[in-house]
Amino acid sequence: MKYILMMAGTKAGVDMYRAWSQSDIQRHFAHLKTLNKDLMESGEFVTNEPLAGPEQAKIVRAGKNGVPITDGVFPEAKEFLLGYWIVDVESPERAYQIAARLSAGPGPGGAPINMPIEVRQILSRKTEEL
């Protein structure tokens, strides 16, 4: 079963992260690199991607005659998606274990940040069936 593990954050949280020491940032990224390596070795890794900040996001709708209408950034959003992992695992419990490990990434001084990670199953419909 495939699951998406979504890491969300707030502007305040991102601003705090930007104030971390270089060693704290390196420790955090080493944790993520090790997690990715372990998932690749177990065959559970599908992909992961960081996302640009909300200041670069646009909302697009089809306007008259199908011409796209682009709305600007919505700074009032309380949380925004920072990045995601897609994993292919045997059970929901395994997806939760991976999410907990992701959540426990080190922050300042090496203490776990315990960031909430949203876990959702990816439905396995083929495009032709839609």
Annotated model-derived regions:
Residues 1-130:
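Conserved, structured core segments of small domains
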